[in-house]
């Protein structure tokens, strides 16, 4: 049994993680990876590297900069630059194709389907609470959930502490 020695004040904020909380994330990630891969496979020299090339570059990126493992967005972007650079693309081509490949991933990543029941529940909760979405990859402005959260908090590192957030977003 939990015992409180002080009165608990009413809640004014409700936070939640998007992935697998409000919708099934597995098909979303699969589609996002596929969208990125489709873009990359259309580039000369990329498809010739085989299906393991992305994984090898991803592992190399993590070895070069281990802190990237704590920020999946930056890890993906760095891996894209590394993979394209290794294939001999110019700096300008690397920048262009890395950006386009990432955008293909991000657009598909934000193409989520939330059931009408969940949307109705969120509408109801938004009448009473400030809703906050915690995410490490979604762009709330690109998906249907952008109409709900007052502030989207992106996970940036393993030491991230929610108590150090700038409270002006509330």
Q: Residue locations for each model-derived region?
A:
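Amphipathic coiled-coil/heptad-repeat helices and related helical stalk/stem segments
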Residues: 1, 114-118, 165
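Active-site neighborhood of HAD-like aspartate-dependent phosphohydrolases
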Residues: 2-56
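Hydrophobic (often cysteine-bearing) scaffold residues that line and stabilize catalytic clefts
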Residues: 25, 29, 72, 76, ...
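Hydrophobic alpha-helical core bundles mediating ligand binding, dimerization, or RNAP-core interactions
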Residues: 29-37, 54-58, 76, 80, ...
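A metal-dependent, Asp-based hydrolase signature
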Residues: 59-102
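Substrate-recognition element of Asp-dependent hydrolases with the DxDx(T/V) motif
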Residues: 96-111, 118-160
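Conserved Lys-Pro-Asp/Glu-containing loop-to-beta segment of HAD-superfamily phosphomonoesterases
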Residues: 152, 161-170
């Amino acid at each position: 049994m939990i015992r409180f020695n002080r009165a608990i004040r009413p809640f004014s904020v409700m936070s939640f993680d998007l992935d697998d909380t409000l919708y099934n994330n597995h098909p979303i990630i699969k589609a996002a990876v596929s969208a990125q891969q489709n873009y990359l496979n259309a580039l000369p020299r990329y498809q010739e590297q085989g299906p393991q090339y992305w994984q090898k570059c991803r592992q190399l990126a993590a070895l070069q900069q281990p802190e990237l493992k704590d920020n999946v967005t930056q890890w993906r972007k760095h891996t894209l630059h590394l993979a394209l650079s290794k294939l001999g693309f110019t700096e300008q081509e690397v920048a262009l194709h890395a950006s386009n490949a990432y955008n293909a991933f991000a657009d598909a990543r934000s193409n989520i389907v939330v059931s009408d029941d969940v949307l109705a529940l969120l509408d109801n909760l938004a009448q009473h609470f400030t809703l906050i979405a915690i995410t490490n990859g979604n762009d709330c402005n690109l998906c249907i959930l952008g109409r709900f959260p007052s502030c989207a908090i992106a996970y940036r590192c393993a030491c991230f502490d929610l108590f150090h957030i700038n409270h002006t977003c509330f």
